[in-house]
UniProtKB/Swiss-Prot annotation:
Function: Component of an export pathway for enterobactin.
Superkingdom per UniProt: Bacteria
Protein name per UniProt: Enterobactin exporter EntS
Membrane topology annotation: Multi-pass membrane protein
Keyword Membrane: yes
GO molecular function ontology, one term from the record: enterobactin transmembrane transporter activity
Keyword Transmembrane in annotation: yes
Disulfide bonds: none
Subcellular location, record wording: Cell inner membrane
SUPFAM superfamilies in UniProt: MFS general substrate transporter
Organism: Shigella dysenteriae serotype 1 (strain Sd197)
Amino acid sequence: MNKQSWLLNLSLLKTHPAFRAVFLARFISIVSLGLLGVAVPVQIQMMTHSTWQVGLSVTLTGGAMFVGLMVGGVLADRYERKKVILLARGTCGIGFIGLCLNALLPEPSLLAIYLLGLWDGFFASLGVTALLAATPALVGRENLMQAGAITMLTVRLGSVNSPMIGGLLLAIGGVAWNYGLAAAGTFITLLPLLSLPALPPPPQPREHPLKSLLAGFRFLLASPLVGGIALLGGLLTMASAVRVLYPALADNWQMSAAQIGFLYAAIPLGAAIGALTSGKLAHSARPGLLMLLSTLGSFLAIGLFGLMPMWILGVVCLALFGWLSAVSSLLQYTMLQTQTPEVMLGRINGLWTAQNVTGDAIGAALLGGLGAMMTPVASASASGFGLLIIGVLLLLVLVELRHFRQTPPQVTASDS
């Protein structure tokens, strides 16, 4: 009998050309967005010398992304998904060209940066939702865990490398280089995506877009399984907002500027390890219980993080959080795709991604408020242990999720 390895199996990239094309496009896109993510705040800070203006740009882009995810979910369930993906990517690239041209002006327009941020945030999220809804058709539902782990690893590696490349470009050529290369990278992603097969949505009756979106909300609220998964995802994202306390905690631990970087790298590193060692997750007979327990463990890690007497122990707690949150996120992704009807995939993926964006913003705001009333150590611990209490209550309440069982897929020689 063949045994499934703990290590992530990358064979999906060899056996599924469509997924390989998506993988390549996603990696290039992550690097391009990383260049953009460095350039926009730096340019606004240089123009205004105001952190408030920088924060406003992030808020506006986040709001546009939220709306785009809602609209994209409806479009992905009504129109051919490949066309939605290509349209969204191409339109994003036009916005990046606009940012590049604006940066080349003798006096760049701040209003143009804000408006193009709204443009790019909206259209980028359209493509994300359509791609998520199309993934089961590209790889098969039995391979969703493997596809999700490969995607997570790609995102983590790209997120680590692209800001460093962006910073180097800023030092060499200025923000216009970042915007120009981000635009070029975005248009390059269209080449592999053009090779995708047609991805028609499932047949369904025509209805008003708002009514269609409300149907997605109703399904989410009426399904204790899918609704519970989405709720856990939101809470997990709130916990990750602990990063807003890193500078204050670094002062408490008397860390040097170089050492602070370890705090920011710990969660991505832990998540990458979680993705690399996810080989057996798809074969769990009780994924719902495993999801709940890994989420509780991640909350406990955040609660203990601020209490550590040495910063290196805090880094270990953050890495543990990254690993456990990766396990929970992979299970969330897989169960959401497999337990959602095909006709609802676009809307439910849009709502799930949107609550992740919202959870991060809410978590950052709550931690900022706690930080104004409590010490950084107390704020971090209160957030972690508070979420742990909520998680324990959900463990008791989400009975269907806790008892959910699946038949593990058959292990073949190619999987081991």
